[in-house]
């Protein structure tokens, strides 16, 4: 098994970015003739992932992983990757994923390309196009490690339905130590986050105040 995705969830649902990763990972898995495997933490909804092309989901449930902390999450993802001989790990470009990526790269001795915007130009060697300079330019990155990590830029590939028969597997959390303890999390609700929005409208100082927003 060679392709693994990390699926983030919030408020009992998979994030849009998780379903985009499933769509993107499915396309690469089909090119390689391999299975697509997902890892989820404290969230069991395998059928949603199956709808977007995931063949197998590994569900890790543990009270200590209720809130995201980078090192324990990275340790568990690395353990799954090593146990399953993963050669390609795909993450989103969320803040949490960007915390995880360098930790995973060190643990797996992996190459890492962030902000990837489309399917690989080549799989041997792995060659990807990524945005850089705050999306003002693009660069081509060649990853030649045995294990590699892709950070997919949000909303760059989209959601593509590709239903599969899925196998669900429960896994115990790997023993880890952390110096951090999350006591409380406050999040806004009822609105679409900027990361998940299809269209973002931005207004500068020239608008002066909210009374002029109707102009754009």
Task: Briefly describe each language-model feature range.
Residues 1-216:
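N-terminal glycine-rich FAD/FM-binding segment characteristic of electron-transfer flavoproteins
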């Amino acid at each position: 098994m060679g392709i693994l995705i990390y699926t983030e969830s919030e408020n009992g649902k998979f994030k849009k970015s998780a379903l985009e990763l499933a769509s993107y990972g499915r396309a690469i898995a089909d090119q390689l003739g391999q299975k697509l495997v997902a890892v989820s933490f404290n969230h069991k909804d395998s059928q949603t992932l199956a709808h977007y092309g995931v063949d197998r989901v590994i569900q890790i449930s543990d009270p200590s992983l209720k809130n995201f902390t980078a090192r324990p999450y990275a340790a568990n993802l690395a353990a799954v990757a090593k146990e399953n001989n993963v050669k390609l790990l795909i993450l989103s470009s969320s803040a949490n994923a960007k915390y995880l990526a360098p930790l995973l790269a060190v643990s797996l001795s992996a190459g890492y390309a962030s902000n990837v915007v489309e399917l690989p130009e080549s799989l041997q060697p792995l060659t990807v196009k990524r945005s850089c300079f705050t999306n003002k330019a693009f660069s081509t990155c060649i990853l030649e490690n045995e294990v590699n990590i892709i950070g997919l830029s949000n909303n760059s590939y989209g959601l593509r339905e590709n239903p599969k028969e899925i196998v669900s597997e429960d896994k115990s959390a790997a023993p880890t130590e952390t110096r951090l303890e999350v006591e409380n999390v406050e999040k806004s609700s009822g609105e679409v986050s900027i990361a998940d929005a299809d269209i973002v409208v931005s207004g500068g100082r020239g608008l002066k105040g909210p009374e002029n927003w109707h102009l754009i």
